Amino acid sequence: MLLDRALPCLLICAAASAHAASAAAPPVRIILVGDSTMASSTGYGDALCARFSPETACINLARGGRSSGSFRAEGRWDEVEALLRAPAGFNATYVLIQFGHNDQPGKPGRSTDLVHEFPANLARYVNEARALGAVPVLVTPLTRRSFRGAWVQDDLAPWSAAVRRVATATEAPLVDLNRLSMADVQAIGPARADALARAGANFDHTHLGPAGAARVAATMTGALLRAAPPLARVLGSAR
């Protein structure tokens, strides 16, 4: 009889203890580093941040028009390093790094050499993030939604391949967003792909409106959970 009465109490106490332990666990921090396809208003970064649990710090430092070279040259990587150096009490910090669009030729002051400079820049970001205790995650560039006939054009393939090679060489987690987003855009076709863009005068085949940001954030969520399984406790559907 006493055991029968005590068992519910034990179960309740155990559940409360587990909840308290979970609540007391140090939070996770996410830092986004990249270009306009990840940045606020034009990319998926904020929509991705909304998919993390409320106690997770998600900081979107991606900026439009930046390449793997100009992001550092402008001092923006210094902001990332300052965050990583400051005592913050996080259980883990993940730095998502996505470049490629503005590293392509024809962008004065931003373009980088694909063979040497671009991969060296990425590897340096990975190594410096690790040296400061963070987990770097490399992300291949989001596809452009440009079709030739019935087929989406893979004009970022060489830069995506370079990102994959750096991820292999540095043993960094990889999200192959280029491959995933290309497959998605190909599957839905040109008309539905156009609905992912910003409306009106801001329309183009690169940047994202709200629907596009939400769709890419959902793709990123699944890919991140595969690339970095510990994020499962803080990453889910949009809140």
Model-derived features: where do they sit?
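Alpha-helical cap/lid subdomain in secreted, periplasmic
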Residues: 79-214, 218-236
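Serine-esterase "nucleophile elbow" of acetyl-processing enzymes
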Residues: 19-70, 78-90
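Bacterial N-terminal signal peptides that target proteins for export
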Residues: 1-8
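Catalytic-site microenvironment of enzymes
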Residues: 239
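Short N-terminal or domain-adjacent regulatory/targeting segments
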Residues: 2, 13, 21-22
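Conserved phosphate-coordination/catalytic loops
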Residues: 71-75, 116
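Bacterial N-terminal signal peptides
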Residues: 8-16
